[in-house]
Amino acid sequence: MTCVTGGFYDEKCYFEISGHACRENDGEYGMPTELDGGEPLACAAVSVLVMTALEKVRALDSDGAFSSASVTVEPGYACFDLETREEYADEVRHAFEFILLGFELLEENYPECVSVA
C-alpha cells in the first residue's frame, strides 16, 4: 500500500509518499506476476506521479522558487519538504494540487493499493 500525506501551510509545502502499491513477490517489490487487483497499473502510476513531482520541483528550483528545498526519492519512499518564496507560492500550490489529484484518483480506483490522508 502506498500512503500519501502532506499539504500546504502558508509558503510551506510538504508531501510524503511511502510504501509500495504492489505486493511483495519473490522477496522483492515490483511488478506482480499476475494482473490481479490493478496492482501493476497503480504501481506504475505512483511512480509516474512521483517522478512528475520531482521534475516539477527541479524546474521550479532552477527558477529560484524555493528559499529551502529538501527532496528525498528512493525505492518505496519520497519526501518533498519545500519552503516557497512568496511570489511562487501559487504556482507551487497548483502544481502539487494537480499531482495530489492524481493520487486521489488512484485511491478512488485502487483503494487497496493507494491511500491519501
Description of each model-found segment:
Residues 47-56:
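Conserved ATP-binding N-box helix of the HATPase_c
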Residues 44:
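A short, polar/charged loop-to-alpha-helix boundary motif
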